[in-house]
C-alpha cells in the first residue's frame, strides 16, 4: 500500500525546490507529512511541450482522491484546472500566491509573440523582464525551448479557466508584497470561487517559503490541522 500524506504540494515555475527546504523541515518536525511533487519540465527533466491538460492529467495521477493539496503560482493554476475538471478530486485546495487569472497585458503579448516565432532569441531586456514577471526566472533566452512554449500555453490556458466551476473548498493565502501575481488577483479568485476563504500576509512576497519560511510553515500547520479536525468531525 502506498504511503499517504497530509499535504501534497505542486511548486511554481522553478527548476529547484531547495528554497522550500526550511518550510518543509519545520512541517516535518511538527508531524505534518508533506509530499512535494516534481513538475515535469521543471524539477523533473523533460523536453516535451506541455499543455494545461497534460499537467492536469499528471496531477490527477500523482495526488490521491480526497487529499489536501497546495499549489504555488503555476502549481495553483494546475490545481485550479484539476478541480474545475474533477470537482470531487480534492477534499480541500490551498492556493499560495496562485497563477490562473487572465489579464491582458503588453508583457504577455511580448512573451507569447516571441515564443511562437520559434527562432533563437538574443538577450532582450524587455523580454527577460516580462519572463521574470511571470516565472521568477531572469533570462528568457536561456530557458529551454520547450518550456518557453509551455509558459505560453499556461498563460493562454487562463483564458479558458472557469473559476466559478471550482467547487472545492479553497483557502487562499497571499502575500501583500507579491509583485508577480499581485494581491488584486487573489481578490479576483476569491470573488469567483463558490467556496473560498482569503487571507493576506503583510510580509510575504510571491515566494513566502523564501521571505518568511517560518511564517508559512506556521500558517500551513494550522490550516492542515484545522482541515483534518474538521474532516474527523471534531
Protein language model regions, located:
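Active-site loop/oxyanion-hole signature of alpha/beta-hydrolase fold enzymes
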Residues: 35-70, 218
Amino acid at each position: 500500500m502506498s504511503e499517504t500524506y497530509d499535504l501534497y504540494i505542486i511548486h511554481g515555475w522553478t527548476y529547484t525546490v531547495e528554497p522550500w527546504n526550511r518550510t518543509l523541515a519545520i512541517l516535518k518536525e511538527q508531524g505534518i507529512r508533506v509530499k512535494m511533487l516534481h513538475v515535469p519540465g521543471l524539477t523533473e527533466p523533460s523536453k516535451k511541450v506541455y499543455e494545461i491538460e497534460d499537467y492536469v492529467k499528471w496531477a490527477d495521477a500523482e495526488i490521491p482522491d480526497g487529499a489536501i493539496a497546495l499549489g504555488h503560482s503555476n502549481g495553483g493554476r494546475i490545481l485550479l484546472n484539476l478541480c474545475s475538471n474533477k470537482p470531487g478530486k480534492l477534499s480541500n485546495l490551498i492556493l499560495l500566491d496562485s497563477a490562473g487569472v487572465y489579464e491582458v497585458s503588453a508583457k504577455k503579448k511580448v512573451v507569447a509573440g516571441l515564443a511562437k516565432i520559434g527562432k533563437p532569441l538574443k538577450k532582450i531586456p524587455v523580454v527577460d523582464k516580462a519572463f521574470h514577471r511571470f516565472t521568477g526566472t531572469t533570462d528568457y533566452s536561456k530557458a529551454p525551448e520547450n518550456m518557453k512554449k509551455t509558459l505560453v500555453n499556461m498563460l493562454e490556458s487562463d483564458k479558458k479557466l472557469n473559476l466559478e466551476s471550482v467547487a472545492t473548498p479553497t483557502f487562499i493565502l497571499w502575500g501583500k508584497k507579491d509583485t508577480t501575481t499581485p494581491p488584486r488577483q487573489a481578490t479576483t479568485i476569491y470573488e469567483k470561487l463558490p467556496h473560498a476563504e482569503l487571507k493576506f500576509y503583510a510580509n510575504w512576497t510571491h515566494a513566502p517559503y523564501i521571505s518568511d519560511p517560518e511564517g508559512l510553515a506556521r500558517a500551513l500547520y494550522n490550516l492542515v490541522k484545522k482541515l483534518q479536525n474538521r474532516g474527523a468531525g471534531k
